[in-house]
Every structure is written in C-alpha cells, then in structure tokens.
Amino acid sequence: PAERICPQLDDFDTTKTYTATDGTTYSYAEYLPAEDNQKNALVIWLHGAGEGGVDPTIDLLGNEVTALAGDEFQELFKGAYVLAPQSPTMWMDDGTGAYQNGDKGSCYAESLFELIETYVKSNEDIDTNRIIIGGCSNGGYMTMEMILKHPDYFAAAYPICEAFQDQYISDEQIES
C-alpha cells in the first residue's frame, strides 16, 4: 500500500464548505473529538495572509495546526473541536481584494461570525463557555476583529503577531 504524503491530515475533514447569507463561501477543516458525552471546547484557527483560497490543508500544514488534533493537546482540553475556516482571499480584505491596513475592517467579519455561530449550533456538545479563537498575523488581525466585535462570545483569544494596528482600538473596546 502507498504511504500517505501527509498522514497528519488524516484526523481532519478538509472537505467542508459553508455559504453565508451574504454569499461568501468558506472552505474549512474540522477535527471532531472522540464522543464522550461531555461538553467540549472549540478551538478556532484563523490562517495568515498567504493561506486564503479553497484548500484548507494549506492552513493546517502551514503552521502545524494539525497539532491541535494531537494527543497532547486533546488531553489538555479533555477533547476539543478544531475549526479552521479559510477566507477566499485574506482576512484583512475590506472588499477590494487588496491587503489593507485595518482601518475599514474586514469584508469577512460578519460572515465568519455567522459560520462560527452556525458551527456551534450544529455541534450541540460544544461548550459555549469554552470557545477559543486565534491565529497568526492576518489571522491575528481577524482574531482581534472578532473579539472586539463580539467580546462576550469568546472565552479566550490567542492573536499571534497580529496585524491589527493599535490606532484602531479604542479604550472602550479594550475595557469590554
């Protein structure tokens, strides 16, 4: 039998898509924890700027997101869903298709949140008190946009080297 080139992808379903009410279609990958009759955390990974498109394996392999399905991580969370949505272009796209500095916000902000809410509702054993969102660079930007727009929805965030410029964060947003 032939060996798989990327066996670390075996635990993920990389064939999922979601079309939001605004018409935006996302490809996404998901990892489902073992069924254990318990509520499980949801960890959301948002990719960097060069990883948009329609192939979520790029997101998973680009930053070793596959480790989130590994035994060590899953044991720490006692089982966790992993959701890795892929923007059609990049999270910092304001609708022009060009990389922008963040002052206008992302054209994907509302449709991404719709995807997340729909995903949570369709997986009843997700613990809504343990929804964690993060990503690096461009994904860190969208992490910041999500937590600033929906501060009560996410339990925690891990924006890594986020591209969100401080000048666009108000004191009121920080306090919320």
Model-identified regions with their sequence ranges:
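A domain-start/cap signature at the N-terminus of enzymes
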Residues: 1-42, 80, 138, 164
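Gly/Ser-rich "nucleophile elbow"/oxyanion-hole loop immediately N-terminal to the catalytic nucleophile
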Residues: 96-137
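Short glycine-enriched nucleophile-adjacent loop
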Residues: 140-151
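Loop/turn elements at helix/coil->beta-strand transitions in domains of secreted/extracellular proteins
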Residues: 38-42, 78-81, 127-131, 151-156, ...
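The feature captures the conserved acid-bearing segment of alpha/beta-hydrolase catalytic domains
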Residues: 155-176
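Alpha/beta-hydrolase-fold catalytic nucleophile elbow
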Residues: 85-86, 134, 160-161
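Structured segments of extracytoplasmic/periplasmic soluble domains
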Residues: 49, 115-123, 149, 153, ...
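Active-site machinery of serine-nucleophile hydrolases
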Residues: 42, 49-109
